């Protein structure tokens, strides 16, 4: 689970999902069928199973195209930046966003990967704030620069757009960030040779008054020394 993916491998995984949703859309167009009934329909038994399939189904080519780049970029960033938590996060956003729609959304079929993309965005954004290491901060800034408008699309827009999927995707991503972002180890800080040499030189420098005698000095009054190596005050 904690296997680290290269950037190329991360992009490949995100591309695989994009190809899958395009294959489904092209299949619908080629055979004159629609899989919209496989979306989430709130508070119905058949619509409950749409939690698993709805992110794969899109209403039109424009709908599919609108989700292509966000899935590719945000998915690649998740796979690359969070090697331990990525699959848990992806699964949780997928299931929880659909469950929220099934419980609370309007009575209609809700389809599309936009709930997933909102979840990924909010995960990357909040995880970057929590962790504050260089990699997470960079992913946060890229995600915000590209898709900061997702803060507004969680509110009602056009009647044919499922803002509920956006909202519950965002809540799922935020919850995952709070719960899972610490699962991934902090990246190892690189030390350049000149930094190491500077640190060693500072340690080797002699005190201008006592020279390097402090390195070998013996404490002549151990009774005044505490466990932390500091001296007690005597009044």
Predicted regions and their residues:
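C-terminal transmembrane module of polytopic alpha-helical membrane proteins
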Residues: 1-3, 154-235
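N-terminal TM1-TM2 helical hairpin plus the immediately adjacent luminal interfacial "cap"
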Residues: 7-88, 98, 103-110
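Membrane-interface micro-motifs in multi-pass membrane enzymes
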Residues: 107-123, 163-165
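Membrane-interfacial alpha-helical segments at the cytosolic side of multi-pass membrane proteins
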Residues: 65-82, 119-130, 171-183
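Alpha-helical transmembrane segments in multi-pass membrane proteins
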Residues: 17-20, 92-93, 97, 101, ...
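Divalent metal-coordination and catalytic microenvironments
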Residues: 21, 52, 63, 115, ...
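Membrane-interface helix caps and helix-loop-helix hairpins in membrane proteins
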Residues: 57-60, 102-111, 129-133, 153-161
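Central hydrophobic cores of alpha-helical transmembrane segments
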Residues: 90-96, 137-147
